[in-house]
């Protein structure tokens, strides 16, 4: 079965290098297509990643596997100490390897603007990727381009931009901009409605809005007042539309400018030269221009206020860092600004303090609340040698700790960076909406012109009036803004809410894939279980001494890195171990060596059988231990089986409850393990697993995932080790447990900040809720436009004899955007079912 593998390339410097790599890959019979750039390759075929990397190396370049579904958000990993789930739940990043830049944008009004700004940024030399977020009015740009070049590109496209250095400044400027924007929209709405409402009411109860010789001067004054309203309260619509026209584009502002402008120009023409129009066509529409501008500005104000609420989760994370830290020196303690704290400084924490930076405790004990980082509500006890993390709170106790990571290098900063990048990404469904939005405005203008022409040539008299009403109403009611906001608003709210539950999503596409899963595969060791195996029994045969058996087994395991080795060494921690010679690791079987003149074998039954050691006499004991969920580790001395060490890795305390939640949600649960089937089935029965794939060697995990996918299943893989990375990459969605290896986390689409399977259930529940919300928004926006535009074009006239008022169209347009934003904000209150 063909697959697409994403590779990160190194050593390429020009087009010739790209061509050489592409030709080398496509010469392989198992490669169907290779898309190569200077930095990456996307290869489709049946070849494995290892084979492709070897081919690239033979061509003279280097390559490594990157995330198959999305570009990794952190380009490098700096291994951290395995002290807490938090510290390892993110790949560390330095200021040098973070090539992303943030821009605050202004002047954008709909998805057409997004496409235009994104294309402008991606055309700048040095830009590898640009993500524009309409909901937050921001752009996240990857690459080596300078901030000045990026700002100039945006301004050339007709919009405003400001380069932002860090999250603190971004937040400050974004809040300033949001407050200023809301104030501006508010007074513009008040001014426009203050003129529009009285004129409309007067027209309804005191005048029929038809110009006559008696009221002509009064209407001329009203027309000039309306023009002033259009300039001062609606000028931004016309300026934006003009800039778009100069750049050969059309946006929502174009529709508003055309609709209100045509209505005013027609009314002023009737006002100045009434003799040119038949008596029945001398109707004025000044109030429509003022009311439409007022209602749309009011809608923008309410939308901006609702958008601010959508970033609530991320703002909570930003609020976690205190402004100062308590520095301990030889002269005593003093409070210093957070920006002055450097790695290596000694800091103090007492009850109630919020931790300012990451570090390691050197003295004292304390209970820390890490809920905002990990979603874990139970305070954690910390002592000397343990890690503490910026943003957590000391509930009780006092400690001294040495700063290890400050500023943008703290776990909290990396979480914020990951969340923000995920919020700026777009799923496939969102990209489809963007494509539609890109042609939406020109199509609406064409529909308005065609509808107006039909009414002009075939409509009732006075044709010019009906033509004007139809064209204006169609232009005003169409709402690309709702379409453009539908996806990003749901993503911002969903990703932010997930972060509150300790679930970090790499990108929006991962959320979409996670919402369609039907099978969840768990690695056993360290995922379903605690990852801390214990020797629960030692049974000897042929009168062999139990202590001697344990001593020899531990001696062999000194050279092994297997998790079971640690359990045996812990059991023999107080014993004097002999020197081992000729140590060998037999992959998937065990270890061998010589000690005190004896040939030793330690491993599974397959190892002893492979070395012609008879195990028939002890098969009953092996089966008995395996049926209880223990892993039988056999020791053979000089060709004879002399001992059985039963090693058991207990299930996590919340594994059963979490798996029950997943069962109720309709997922099929699969356990992937290298254990023998008897042991694996015993553990699966205890945990409530549906299917067991046992006896899988480390390099066979990805193949096991492939087999499940070939059955038509949508598969998530949950793991934490380096050997899980290929399976995490192969799965439709890889989920890395907090505390897992950096390689696993870098490969996974979703990272859990707490080492709990409840996080898996939470992640999948939030993914489903987010996609459901996204579909509701998109469906609502499509239905609104699909019904609104035909109604505005007069489709109901033959049946009801009525047309939609342009003012009602303006109100409906504003309401559609507010509805989308409000619906997305419901995700901020979402709680996964227990």
Swiss-Prot record:
GO terms for biological process: copper ion homeostasis; viral translational frameshifting. Cu(+) 2 binds at residues 110, 113. CDD domains: HMA (cd00371), P-type_ATPase_Cu-like (cd02094). Keywords: ATP-binding, Cell inner membrane, Cell membrane, Copper, Copper transport, Cytoplasm, Ion transport, Magnesium, Membrane, Metal-binding, Nucleotide-binding, Phosphoprotein, Repeat, Translocase, Transmembrane, Transmembrane helix, Transport. It comes from the Bacteria. Residues 3-64, 99-162 form the HMA domain. It catalyses: Cu(+)(in) + ATP + H2O = Cu(+)(out) + ADP + phosphate + H(+). Pfam families: E1-E2_ATPase (PF00122), HMA (PF00403), Hydrolase (PF00702). It is an enzyme of class 7 (translocase). The active site is at residue 523. Cu(+) 1 binds at residues 14, 17. InterPro entries: ATPase_P-typ_cyto_dom_N (IPR023299), ATPase_P-typ_P_site (IPR018303), ATPase_P-typ_TM_dom_sf (IPR023298), ATPase_P-typ_transduc_dom_A_sf (IPR008250), HAD-like_sf (IPR036412), HAD_sf (IPR023214), Heavy-metal-associated_CS (IPR017969), HMA_dom (IPR006121). Belongs to the cation transport ATPase (P-type) (TC 3.A.3) family. Type IB subfamily. This is Copper-exporting P-type ATPase.
């Amino acid at each position: 079965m063909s697959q697409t593998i994403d590779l990160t390339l190194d050593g390429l410097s020009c087009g010739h290098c790209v061509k050489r790599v592409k030709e080398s890959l496509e010469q392989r019979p198992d490669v169907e297509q290779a898309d190569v750039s200077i930095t990456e390759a996307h290869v489709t075929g049946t070849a494995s990643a290892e084979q492709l990397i070897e081919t690239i190396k033979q061509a003279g370049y280097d390559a490594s596997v990157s995330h198959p579904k999305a570009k990794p958000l952190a380009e490098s990993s700096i291994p951290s100490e395995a002290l807490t789930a938090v510290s390892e739940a993110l790949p560390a990043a330095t200021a040098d390897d973070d090539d992303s830049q943030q821009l605050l944008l202004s002047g954008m009004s709909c998805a057409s603007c997004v496409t235009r700004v994104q294309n402008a940024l991606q055309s700048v030399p040095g830009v590898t990727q640009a993500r524009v977020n309409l909901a937050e009015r921001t752009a996240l740009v990857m690459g080596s381009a300078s901030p000045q070049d990026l700002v100039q590109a945006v301004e050339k496209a007709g919009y405003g931009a400001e380069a932002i250095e860090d999250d603190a400044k971004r937040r400050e400027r974004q809040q300033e901009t949001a407050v200023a924007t809301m104030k501006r929209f508010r007074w513009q709405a008040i001014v426009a409605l203050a003129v529009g409402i009285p004129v409309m009411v007067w027209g309804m109860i005191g005048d029929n809005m038809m110009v006559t010789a008696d009221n002509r001067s009064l209407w001329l004054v009203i027309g000039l007042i309306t023009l002033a309203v259009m300039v001062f309260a609606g000028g931004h619509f016309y300026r934006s539309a003009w800039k778009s026209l100069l750049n050969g584009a059309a946006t929502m502002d174009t529709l508003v400018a055309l609709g209100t402008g045509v209505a005013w120009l027609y009314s002023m023409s009737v006002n100045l030269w009434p003799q040119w129009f038949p008596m029945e066509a001398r109707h004025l529409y000044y109030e429509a221009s003022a009311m439409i501008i007022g209602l749309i500005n009011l809608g923008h104000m309410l939308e901006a206020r609702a958008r601010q609420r959508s970033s609530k989760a991320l703002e909570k994370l930003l609020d976690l860092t205190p402004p100062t830290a308590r520095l301990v020196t030889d002269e005593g303690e003093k409070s210093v600004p957070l920006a002055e704290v450097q790695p290596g400084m000694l800091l103090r924490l007492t009850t109630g303090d919020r931790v300012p930076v990451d570090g390691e405790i050197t003295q004292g004990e304390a209970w820390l609340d890490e809920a905002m980082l990990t979603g874990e509500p139970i305070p954690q006890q910390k002592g000397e040698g343990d890690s503490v993390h910026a943003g957590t709170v000391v509930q009780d106790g006092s400690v001294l700790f040495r700063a290890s990571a400050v500023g943008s290098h703290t776990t909290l900063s990396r979480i914020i960076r990951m969340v923000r990048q995920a919020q700026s990404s777009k799923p496939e469904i969102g990209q489809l909406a963007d494509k539609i939005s890109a042609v939406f405005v020109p199509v609406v203008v064409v529909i308005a012109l065609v509808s107006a022409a039909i009414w002009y040539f075939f409509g009732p008299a006075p044709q010019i009036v009906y033509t004007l009403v139809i064209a204006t109403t169609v232009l005003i009611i169409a709402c690309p803004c709702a379409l453009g906001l539908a996806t990003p608003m749901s993503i911002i709210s969903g990703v932010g809410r997930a972060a509150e539950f300790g679930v970090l999503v790499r990108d929006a596409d991962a959320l979409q894939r996670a919402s369609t899963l039907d099978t969840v595969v768990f690695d056993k060791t360290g995922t379903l279980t605690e990852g801390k195996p214990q020797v629960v029994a030692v049974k000897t045969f042929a009168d062999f001494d139990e202590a001697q058996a344990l001593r020899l087994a531990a001696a062999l395991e000194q050279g092994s890195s297997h998790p079971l080795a640690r359990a045996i060494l812990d059991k023999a921690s107080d014993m004097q171990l002999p020197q081992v010679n000729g140590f060998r690791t037999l992959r998937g079987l065990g270890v061998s060596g010589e000690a005190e003149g004896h040939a030793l074998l330690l491993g599974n039954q397959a190892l002893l059988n492979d070395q012609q050691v008879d195990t028939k006499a002890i098969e009953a004991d092996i089966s008995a231990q395996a049926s209880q969920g223990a892993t039988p580790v056999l020791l053979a001395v000089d060709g004879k089986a002399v001992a059985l060490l039963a090693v058991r890795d207990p299930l996590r305390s919340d594994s059963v409850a979490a798996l029950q939640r997943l069962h109720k949600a309709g997922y099929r649960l699969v356990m992937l393990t290298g254990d023998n089937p008897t042991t694996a089935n015993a553990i699966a029965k205890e945990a409530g697993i549906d299917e067991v794939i046992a006896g899988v060697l480390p390099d066979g995990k990805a193949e096991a995932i492939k087999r499940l996918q070939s059955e038509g299943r949508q598969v998530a893989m949950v793991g934490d080790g380096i050997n899980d990375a290929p399976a995490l990459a192969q799965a439709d969605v890889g989920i890395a447990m907090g505390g897992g290896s950096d390689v696993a986390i870098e490969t996974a689409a979703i990272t859990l900040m707490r080492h709990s399977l409840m996080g898996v259930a939470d992640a999948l529940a939030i993914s489903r809720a987010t996609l459901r919300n996204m579909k509701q928004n998109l469906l609502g926006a499509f239905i609104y436009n699909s019904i609104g535009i035909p109604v505005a074009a007069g489709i109901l006239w033959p049946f009801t004899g009525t047309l939609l008022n342009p003012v009602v169209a303006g109100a409906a347009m504003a309401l559609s955007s507010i509805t989308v934003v409000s619906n997305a904000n419901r995700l901020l209150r979402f709680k996964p079912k227990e």
